[in-house]
Each structure stands twice: as structure tokens, then as C-alpha cells.
């Protein structure tokens, strides 16, 4: 999933940066968690170590491991899942739904040119009461005494004889959500939205500082992502780092790399990041250019400047060949190009400060051995918050100017998806105000008796259940109320 080839490109070009993500003392850093993406990664890691664990036991083991790290690093997770909190909602919005709806409407490329390119309105843009959240339980609602729920669907049909098989992932979805809710963690009922889309909404409404996921399509939606929280310095990818490296604006980035989205292009019809850049005759910055960019970042660290105005698209020329001219102009004038300093949450001293050459393979001083005055962290944190507020993506609708009129099914799918992303992340003007609707956040009252009941009901071995419960009580203390965390992080 994501943008095909983006992760490899980011690693190769040193765009994966390691950061401490240490907020000032007394603060929690809010982070959206694409729960199934993260849990699948952990399940693959741990289920081979514990082959005797059943689905619920391995799920709880991964959950305990994840919650312990969140507590250690003062991260405040807001969990986001596909198909709602009951794992039963059909997904009718997002990339997969757009592809399915478009291919059902158009059988041939000739039909695509006559079809409306607008996607259906999402719950975020719908002015009516959102039907996507109609099944949400009220805060503090407990499960019925006999409510055992149903387990997530098992693995699909077995692979043909002789075909390479992947190990079945032992992840109990509904059990995982119920434990998190009983422990009092904040969550989003994505309803009929994909989890990626809900995470992007939390990021662009300045609710979270990062999205914890390995899906690079969040970068296409303008988000900064965290790849792994278990390491000392956390590997991250900033969307603005990509834009500065590519020498392009966000609308250009969205319109160009939508071709790489794997969910929009079935049967390997997507383009890779390298292929798209090669078609545009893009060349990577030299080391001297990277050093100059780093010096500009340091010189401009106290004053953020706006990105240069885009050249208007030539009238009557709506093919992707115009990208070659645009990028050639930007590369030719790169000595005069002034990047904004990168936006990132407060980092710790001793971490990689040179944004141009930082690498995920660097040997860094462990964060716990680095002493930074709290006053310095507070100042850096305030600078980060001010920068995030100034850099709201207002120009996302300009991406449509860089797309040709859809003449094929693939182009129609891309056009609809770009419009859909714009509806998710671009604020709307309401008189003197610019507003972006945030999805509702829910947080049930912590009920340790309920959590214990859920665990012991599904994990029948008493010793295993007791061990996991002891880990939960030790490493997953009662989380703060999400409104207090967000107010302190963004408003103080």
C-alpha cells in the first residue's frame, strides 16, 4: 500500500530522519496511530517468537509492547481503525472505494471522458449530520455482560499447491479495540472512512503532530509520518522534506505522484516514484546544493518565508509533459530558491540537525543520555506550534490545474482521488474564517474491571492472562483526557 517505491527512495536519498520527539516536561505529544497497520507489523514480528500463542494472546502481547513505548516516550496515541470500532462498517470512501465505483461506472476508456470527475462527498465535507458515525457508543458506555462479540474474519483461502505461502496473521481486531477502549485510550470511529483518511484529517486539523504508520500514501496527503517508535531516535519522514528535495509545491507533488498510489491502480498499473521522476527529467540535488540548502535552513531558522509562486499552467496544454518544463525551470534556478526551514517537533540535542544529510543509519547518542534544559524544549515547542499554524495547506485545490482532463479510466480515478484528498485536508472559507471539520474523538472512561473481564474471557490460560494484565497495569497507566493533552500541546 502507499506510493510505490517511495519508501525505498526516501531511504536511498536520506529523507528518513531520526528524531527524539521529546516534548517539554509535562507535555504529551499527540500522535495518530493507524492501528491495523502498526499491529500487523508487530504481529509479524512476534508471532514467530511465540508460536504457541493463539490470536488473542499474540494480539495482547503486541498491544502491551506498543503501549509501553508510548508511555516511555510521552506520546499520546489517538487510535484510528478501518471499518469503525465494531469492525463491521463498510468502507465507502477513500482510494479503494473510488476505484471500485469508477470501474463499475466505466467499462472502457471511451466512457471515462463522459463521466463526472467528482467523487461522492465525504463525511468531513457533508454539511448534514454525519451518518458515518451513527453507531457510536456514548462515552462511558460499558459492554453488555454477555457481549462476546465476534472474532475477526480468518485468513482467506489457502494458496494453491506449490505456491509460496505467507504465515497467517494472528490478529484479533475486535478484541484489540475493546481492550484499548476499556483502558481509556482516545480513538476515532472512522465509520465508512479508511483509516488513512481519518489520520490525515487529524494531522491537518492540528490535532496530532505525527501519524504512526508505514503507509506512504499519508505523505501524498501532506502528513509527517513515524515509521517505528521502538527505537531511541524515531525514524520519520516529513512531507516538507520531500517537497524541498523535489523542488516542488504540494499541489505539484499531489498531482504528480497520484500515479504511484497502489490502491488506485490495480494489476501493477501504477508507476514507481523513480519512473515518474525520470519522465520529468528530475535530478537529485548535488552534495554542494544540499550543503547550501542546509546553510539556508540554519540562516532562516528564525523567520519562515513563503514558497515561491507557481508558474501558471500553459493554456491549452493539459498533458503531463508540462512537468518537464516546470521542474527544469525550478532546477535551473535552484541557486536562488529559498526553502522554508523544516517544521518538526522539538528535538533533543545530539540528534541530527543537518536536514540535508541526516541518515537513518547514523550512530546517535541515546536520547536518555542527552540533557536538554526544559526551557529550551519549551521554546522549541512553541516555535514548532507556530510554524504548524502558519503552514496550513491552503493551495491543495491547485493540484487540479496540473491534471489533464480525464480521458481514460485511470485518469478519472486519479482525478477523483485528488479531489477527495482536497476535500479532506483543505480548509474551507466561511466569511473571515478558514475552517476544516475535525472528525470526532472519543474516549471511554477507564474501566479496569472491564479490561480484566475481556482479557480473561478470551485468553483461557490463567498464567498468560495474569502476566499480560500485570504488564498493562504497570506500563499502561490511565491516560489523560484528550482535550487536556491537546490544549496543553497546541495552545500553551
Swiss-Prot record:
Site (Necessary for the endonuclease activity): 215
GO CC, alphabetical: virion component
Any one of the GO BP annotations: symbiont-mediated degradation of host mRNA
Ranges where the record places region Disordered: 110-130, 288-307, 334-371
Enzyme Commission number(s) of this protein: 3.1.27.-
Pfam families: XPG_I (PF00867)
Keywords for this protein: Decay of host mRNAs by virus, Endonuclease, Eukaryotic host gene expression shutoff by virus, Host gene expression shutoff by virus, Host mRNA suppression by virus, Host-virus interaction, Hydrolase, Inhibition of host innate immune response by virus, Interferon antiviral system evasion, Late protein, Nuclease, RNA-binding, Viral immunoevasion, Virion
Subcellular location(s) per record: Virion
UniProt entry tagged with the keyword Nuclease: yes
This protein's record includes keyword Nuclease: yes
Highest taxon of source: Viruses
GO molecular function, one term: RNA binding
Top class in the EC scheme: hydrolase
Description of how the protein assembles with itself and partners: Interacts with human EIF4H, EIF4A1 and EIF4A2; interaction with eIF4AI and EIF4A2 presumably allows Vhs protein to associate with the eIF4F cap-binding complex.
Function in brief: Minor structural protein that acts as an endoribonuclease during lytic infection. Degrades host mRNAs in the cytoplasm by cutting them at preferred sites, including some in regions of translation initiation. Together with inhibition of host splicing by ICP27, contributes to an overall decrease in host protein synthesis. Also, after the onset of viral transcription, accelerates the turnover of viral mRNA, thereby facilitating the sequential expression of different classes of viral genes.
UniProt record similarity statement: Belongs to the herpesviridae VHS protein family.
Protein name in UniProt: Virion host shutoff protein
Amino acid at each position: 500500500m502507499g506510493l510505490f517505491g517511495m519508501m525505498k527512495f526516501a531511504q536511498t536519498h536520506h529523507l528518513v530522519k531520526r528524531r527524539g520527539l521529546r516534548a517539554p516536561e509535562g507535555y504529551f505529544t499527540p500522535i495518530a496511530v493507524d492501528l491495523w497497520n502498526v499491529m500487523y507489523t508487530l504481529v509479524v514480528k512476534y508471532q514467530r517468537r511465540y508460536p504457541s500463542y493463539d490470536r488473542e494472546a499474540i494480539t495482547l502481547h503486541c498491544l502491551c509492547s506498543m503501549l509501553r513505548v508510548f508511555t516511555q516516550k510521552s506520546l499520546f496515541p489517538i487510535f484510528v481503525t478501518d471499518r469503525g470500532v465494531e469492525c463491521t462498517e463498510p468502507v465507502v470512501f477513500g482510494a479503494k472505494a473510488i476505484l471500485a465505483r469508477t470501474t463499475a461506472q466505466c467499462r472502457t476508456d471511451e466512457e471515462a471522458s463522459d463521466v463526472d470527475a467528482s467523487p461522492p462527498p465525504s463525511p468531513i465535507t457533508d454539511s448534514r449530520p454525519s451518518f458515518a458515525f451513527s453507531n457510536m457508543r456514548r462515552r462511558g458506555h460499558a459492554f453488555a455482560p454477555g457481549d462476546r462479540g465476534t472474532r475477526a474474519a480468518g485468513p482467506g483461502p489457502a494458496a494453491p499447491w506449490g505456491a509460496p505461502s505467507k504465515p497467517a496473521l494472528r490478529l484479533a481486531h475486535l478484541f484489540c479495540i475493546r481492550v484499548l477502549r476499556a483502558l481509556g485510550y482516545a480513538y476515532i470511529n472512522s465509520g465508512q472512512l479508511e483509516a488513512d483518511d481519518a489520520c490525515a484529517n487529524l494531522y491537518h486539523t492540528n490535532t496530532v503532530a505525527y501519524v504512526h504508520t508505514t503507509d506512504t500514501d499519508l505523505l501524498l496527503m501532506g502528513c509527517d509520518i513515524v515509521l517505528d517508535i521502538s527505537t531511541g531516535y524515531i525514524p520519520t519522514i516529513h512531507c516538507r522534506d520531500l517537497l524541498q528535495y523535489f523542488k516542488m509545491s504540494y499541489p505539484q507533488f499531489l498531482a504528480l505522484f497520484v500515479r504511484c498510489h497502489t490502491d488506485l491502480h490495480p494489476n501493477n498499473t501504477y508507476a514507481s516514484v523513480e519512473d515518474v521522476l525520470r519522465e520529468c527529467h528530475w535530478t537529485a540535488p548535488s552534495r554542494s546544493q544540499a550543503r547550501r540548502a542546509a546553510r539556508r535552513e540554519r540562516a532562516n531558522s528564525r523567520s519562515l518565508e513563503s514558497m515561491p509562486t507557481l508558474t501558471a499552467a500553459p493554456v491549452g496544454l493539459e498533458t503531463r509533459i508540462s512537468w518537464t518544463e516546470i521542474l527544469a525551470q525550478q532546477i535551473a534556478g535552484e541557486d536562488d530558491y529559498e526553502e522554508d526551514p523544516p517544521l518538526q517537533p522539538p528535538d533533543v540535542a545530539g540528534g541530527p540537525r543537518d536536514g540535508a544529510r541526516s541518515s537513518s543509519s547514523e550512530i546517535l547518542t541515546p536520547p536518555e543520555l542527552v540533557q536538554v534544559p526544559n526551557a529550551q524544549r519549551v521554546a522549541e515547542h512553541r516555535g514548532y506550534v507556530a510554524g504548524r499554524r502558519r503552514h496550513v495547506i491552503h493551495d491543495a485545490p491547485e493540484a487540479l490545474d496540473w491534471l489533464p482532463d480525464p480521458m481514460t479510466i485511470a485518469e478519472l480515478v486519479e482525478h477523483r482521488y485528488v479531489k477527495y484528498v482536497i476535500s479532506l485536508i483543505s480548509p474551507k472559507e466561511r466569511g473571515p474564517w478558514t475552517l476544516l471539520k475535525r472528525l470526532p474523538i472519543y474516549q471511554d472512561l477507564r474501566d479496569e474491571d472491564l479490561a480484566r473481564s475481556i482479557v480473561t474471557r478470551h485468553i483461557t490460560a490463567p498464567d498468560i492472562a495474569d502476566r499480560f494484565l500485570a504488564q498493562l497495569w504497570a506500563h499502561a497507566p490511565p491516560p489523560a483526557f484528550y482535550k487536556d493533552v491537546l490544549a496543553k500541546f497546541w495552545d500553551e
